[in-house]
Amino acid sequence: MILIIYAHPYPHHSHANKRMLEQAGTLENVEIRSLYHLYPDFNIDVAAEQEVLSRASLIVWQHPMQWYSVPPLLKLWMDKVLTHGWAYGHGGTALHGKHLLWAVTTGGGENHFAIGSHPGFDVLSQPLQATALYCGLKWLPPFAMHCTFICDDDTLQAQARQYKQRLLTWQEVNHG
């Protein structure tokens, strides 16, 4: 099962993430959990989140990039759900062998994240990749949609279809 952990503080403002979720939602064996819908008070049900994670083969962290990082509720979710003895540390093997895909949208262009005057995209992904590896997850190359503030609808739809294809290809290769 593909589990999409979706974290957008203002989902009604997001055209890119909406289209990504619409495309992903057409696939079989996909569950989408919208953190800001489930936990508007930031009171995360850790047991429920761990249970659904245990059923997933591919975990997707999907969100808009905010200040070169994840939205606050996704960070809190990581802190609360990825616990010692469950996700890492002695006895913490619940996520071992599962795959993780970082699916991120940005307002800036891809060149905005080039090495030089701005941190490179590879650098920005390091904390998430380190978290994944620490929990025994297999890190997959990220999926990024750039320039989402200025893209026309046709471009957003095309990129959302690429996202769906990425998930479908993973399912076909991994029988997930």
UniProtKB/Swiss-Prot annotation:
Main location, first listed in the record: membrane
Gene Ontology, cellular component aspect: plasma membrane
A molecular-function term among this protein's GO annotations: FMN binding
GO terms, biological process: positive regulation of potassium ion transmembrane transport; potassium ion transport
InterPro entries: Flavodoxin_fold, Flavoprotein-like_sf, K_H_efflux_KefF, KefG/KefF
Cofactor(s) required for function per UniProt: FMN
EC number in record: 1.6.5.2
Membrane disposition: Peripheral membrane protein
Keyword set includes Flavoprotein: yes
Keywords: Cell inner membrane, Cell membrane, Flavoprotein, FMN, Membrane, NAD, Oxidoreductase
Cellular compartment(s): Cell inner membrane
Top-tier EC class: oxidoreductase
Record bears the keyword Cell membrane: yes
One Pfam family of this chain: Flavodoxin_2
Recorded catalytic activity of this chain's protein: a quinone + NADH + H(+) = a quinol + NAD(+); a quinone + NADPH + H(+) = a quinol + NADP(+)
Binding site residues for FMN: H8, S14, H15, A16, N17, M65, Q66, W67, Y68, T105, T106, G107, G108
Known role: Regulatory subunit of a potassium efflux system that confers protection against electrophiles. Required for full activity of KefC. Shows redox enzymatic activity, but this enzymatic activity is not required for activation of KefC.
Similarity section: Belongs to the NAD(P)H dehydrogenase (quinone) family. KefF subfamily.
Subunit: Homodimer. Interacts with KefC.
The protein, known as: Glutathione-regulated potassium-efflux system ancillary protein KefF
Chain's gene name: kefF
